[in-house]
Regions:
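Bacterial N-terminal signal peptides that target proteins for export
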Residues: 1-9
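C-terminal motif of bacterial Sec signal peptides marking the signal peptidase cleavage site
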Residues: 17-19
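Acidic, Ser/Thr/Pro
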Residues: 21-126
Length: 126
């Protein structure tokens, strides 16, 4: 027996997972501008490998408050060198102390959110 509500929930879950997908490696020579729509309480991540000496330049605006962080996984722990709550804009330069796969992550609040961000990786000189 199929329930319309179950189909709706499954569809929303698929959309939320699609919003979480990373867009692949950032080209160090090309900043990337992204426009992303987020459903209520949806997440979006953009991940990349960074090493000491690299620099991650980022900035974003959102149409509604979001939670934002830059994080990596260390075993079962999630380490967040940058974490902000309920903001509609932020920018900064993140310089990692460790070589890790880092993710920028945004989480929408209770309303749909339009997210615009720019990210650029500057690799350390050889």
């Amino acid at each position: 027996m199929t329930h319309p509500r179950a189909a709706l929930v499954a569809g929303a879950a698929i959309l939320a997972l699609a919003a979480c997908a990373s867009r692949g490696p950032v080209d160090p020579d090309a900043p990337r501008d992204v426009h992303q729509s987020l459903a209520p309480h949806a997440l979006h991540e953009d991940c990349m490998k960074l090493a000491p000496g690299d620099r991650l330049d980022y900035r974003f605006t959102s149409s509604a408050p979001v939670a934002f962080n830059v994080h990596y996984h260390a075993g079962n722990a999630v380490v967040m060198p940058i974490a902000r709550e309920a903001i509609t804009a932020d920018s900064g330069i993140f310089q990692p102390a460790l070589a890790e796969d880092y993710c920028l992550m945004w989480e929408a609040g209770p309303e749909p959110t339009a997210l615009d961000y720019r990210v650029a990786v500057r690799r350390r000189a050889p």
